Structures are given as C-alpha cells and as structure tokens.
Amino acid sequence: MKLGIVGLPNVGKSTLFNSLTKAGAESANYPFCTIDPNVGIVSVPDERIDRLGELYHSKKIVPAVIEFVDIAGLVKGASKGEGLGNQFLANIREVDAIVHVVRCFEDENIVHVDGSIDPARDIETINLELIFSDIEILERRISKIAKQARMDKTLAKELKLAEAVKAHLEDGHMAKTYELGEDEDDQAWFKMYNLLTAKPVI
C-alpha cells in the first residue's frame, strides 16, 4: 500500500514522515521545504505471519509493507498551477490513500502560509483543490468523448456518468460520496478516472 502525506506547506508533513519511517528528510520552518517527494518503506509487524512461519518452517518470511510518500505542500490555487501545484497533484494520483496533515497548534515561531491557524479552513483549502483538479480531469474526458458518444452507445453511457460525477463535484462534494451503483461499466470507468477525491483519507 502506498500512502501520500499531504497538507499545506509548513504543517509538519516531513516531521510525521520522519517519525513513521525513521528517515532523515529535511524538515524546516519555511514553505516548500520539500519539493521532490520523500519516499520511505515501513514493514508491518504481524504475529500471525511469524506463527505461520514457525508452523511451516519457512526459510524466509516477508512482512507486508507500507510505502509512505512525503509530498510537497499544497496552496490555494494549486489546481491552476500555484506553488508546486501541478507537481503536487500528479504525485497524489500515484498513491492509494491520503494522509492529510492539518496544523492545530499555535506557535509564533512557525510560519503559517495563510497567516493564522484555522484547521477547518485548511481542510477546505486542500479538499477544494483536489475537487478542482478532479473536475478538470472529467472536463478533459468529456471533451474527448462527447462527439463520438453521439454514435457510440458505450461512450454515451460513459459520458452520462462523467457528467453526473462532474456535477457532483461542482456541488462541492468529494467523488467518494458519489453513489455509483453496481453497474460494472460505471465502476470500471470511475476507477479509470483515478480521481483524487475518490481516494480514502486519514
């Protein structure tokens, strides 16, 4: 499993990454300390695997691992390329789930990118940028298949789904709250879009 650690600049993403992975990623009191993603792999202890290894006299026991990715900070306007926006969003698309770090503490020595501490605002900023990015993905797909959909029933069906999900996002909702139903084609297309707001969030 691959988890992406995301949040605004300077909220402690790299500090959390270092705590989880025992890595030595740079962590400093200025925005965009992290530019290229830091990657760390952590083994997951499991007594059941150890016990099975003993029972079957396994020569080698390979535990499950979690890959953590410390991703550059996001700012308002990232979906339009502000800050390291495009790079940030591309890095998030590669992960299985998002670990969202939100600053809830006051410290005048640590700069906040928006000048004040407001966790609810910060969460909304991140969520909106992810939503805007997903809308852009769907707009590109809709534009690509709209003409062909007039003569292709399968594409017409996909177009209907893409437009419905886009409308859901435009209402301010995350893709994961869209009621997809059990249609296998819809499920396959939805997965293909790889929408950021469809990913699990911790």
Regions found by a protein language model. Name each.
Residues 59, 85-202:
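Conserved C-terminal guanine-recognition region of P-loop GTPase G domains, centered on the G4
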